[in-house]
Design a protein with these regions (language model features):
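Short alpha-helical donor nucleotide-sugar binding micro-motif in glycosyltransferases
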Residues: 268, 276-281
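Aromatic "clamp/platform" in nucleotide-sugar-dependent glycosyltransferases that forms part
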Residues: 289
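A charged, aromatic-enriched C-terminal amphipathic alpha-helix characteristic of glycosyltransferases
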Residues: 67-68, 335, 347-382
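Short hydrophobic beta-strand element within catalytic cores of glycosyltransferases
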Residues: 306-310
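Membrane-proximal helix-turn-helix segments that form the acceptor-binding/catalytic region
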Residues: 77, 115, 127-164, 172
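Conserved acidic donor-binding segment of nucleotide-sugar-dependent glycosyltransferases
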Residues: 321-322, 326-334, 340-347
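A conserved mid-protein helix/loop that constitutes part of the nucleotide-sugar donor-binding site
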Residues: 6-10, 210, 217-233
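Glycosyltransferase donor-sugar binding loop
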Residues: 25, 29-30, 215, 236-252, ...
Length: 384
């Protein structure tokens, strides 16, 4: 389950205090099904989950294929017609639902990132950074879809009773760069209660000795390969959380062996297990490329784990270097190793944890405030 899904799921109960809610998705995860069942929220889904396109030709048809699935979800049309407000969280296939929403209904789009498969090359690289196919040809094949994406976002922005927010200052700047639009800022959130370790399990991690944690589906964009490379000669192992394609995990295993880095690819973990693994780690690390916000730093703050991250993207919104964690230049290997050594120091860990919690408070990243911010967007749309 990705960070965006975790953020959405943790906010649903708090949104229900502001709105009577229904939830629609093309591919529900078990955690979403569970919370909807527990809280008696209507969950509108297709009979068969929509599969995310992976090759360039399928990506071109992404909008059309997902729209057909949205149209066939039983009860969705009626739910839309009866809505006072619709909040869309961007993701694969989500944008096409806009075509089904009458102009009379206020809509807010939380644009977590511009479509990276269309506007960047990083998603078209193998886990080791090599192109999956000729990048020039890929760019050419996707040119039509790229133009359509820009037009769709601009048309939505000009629609009456519509609003767009990015999830970080970095994302807001990327939206301006790609779509030439000035948009709002809606931070993600954190529920500190999710990171209280209920029961320790020392045998959970299948590694000996100290380790760092890297979260995110194994890929080049998440920096998995580079994280392993960085750990060479540190005597630190890696716990990777997020899974990946078998072919990619096999390549990463071979790479790890060549770097003499032990890696444990964790199975799907419960929230408590995730908290345990993070709590017992040397640090939470990431060399992700252009991460739009990245929930993992604030999750590290919440659990008291040092956050050591690449000095790029949305990580710079939450981490203040040497105050509540470290921001390291991608290729500065010496600084990475020094930071991981710092993360072992008890006093530094305590300081970064304290300052990290202060950062969460300063940005007001509580779920209650997230729901309040969305409610204010709704009020602005109906009164504007």
């Amino acid at each position: 389950m990705g960070g965006a899904e975790r953020d959405l799921i943790r906010n649903i109960p708090f949104l229900s205090e502001k709105f009577s809610i229904k939830i629609a998705t093309l591919d529900p995860v078990e955690e979403l099904k569970s919370i909807c069942e527990k809280m008696n929220f209507e969950l509108l889904t297709p009979e068969k989950s929509w599969n995310v396109p992976k090759d360039p030709i399928s990506i071109i048809l992404d909008n059309d294929s997902s729209l057909n699935i949205w149209k066939n979800i039983e009860g969705l049309g009626e739910a839309i017609e009866n809505s006072d407000f619709i909040h869309i969280v961007s993701g694969d296939g989500s944008m096409s639902i806009i075509n089904l929403i009458p102009n009379s209904i206020p809509v807010h789009l939380h644009l977590l990132e511009p479509h990276r498969g269309l506007h960047e090359e990083v998603l078209h690289l193998k886990v080791n950074g090599q192109p999956k196919r000729n990048l020039g040809l890929t760019k050419l094949l996707l040119s039509r879809a790229r133009k359509r994406d820009i037009l769709q976002i601009k048309n939505f922005s000009s629609r009456k009773k519509s609003s767009i927010s990015g999830n970080s200052k970095f994302t807001v700047s990327r939206i301006k760069e790609i779509y030439n639009l000035e948009v709002g800022l809606l931070w993600p959130s954190i529920d500190l209660a999710d990171f209280i370790v209920e029961e320790e399990d020392s045998s959970l991690v299948e590694l000996n000795g100290p380790y760092v944690v890297n979260i995110g589906r194994a890929s080049w964009v998440k920096g998995t390969w580079e994280t392993i490379s960085m750990l060479e000669n540190t005597n630190l192992s890696l716990v990777h959380i997020g899974g990946g394609e078998k072919e990619d995990l096999d390549l990463l295993n071979k790479h790890a062996k060549s770097c003499k880095v032990d890696v444990w690819f964790a199975p799907r973990l419960t929230q408590n297990e995730l908290a345990i693994v993070m709590k017992n780690s040397r640090a939470s690390v990431s060399l992700a490329h252009g991460e739009p916000f990245g929930l993992t730093p604030i999750e590290a703050f919440a659990i008291g784990t040092p956050a050591v991250y690449v000095n790029e993207g949305g990580f710079t919104d939450t981490i203040i270097d040497k105050e509540n964690g470290r921001l390291i230049e991608r290729h500065d290997l010496h600084s990475w190793h020094l930071a991981l050594k710092e993360a072992e120091d008890v006093d530094i860990r305590a300081k970064w944890s304290e300052k990290g919690l202060e950062r969460i408070e300063k940005l007001n990243l509580s779920c209650e405030m997230h729901a309040e911010r969305i409610f204010k967007i709704y009020q602005q749309l109906i009164n504007g």
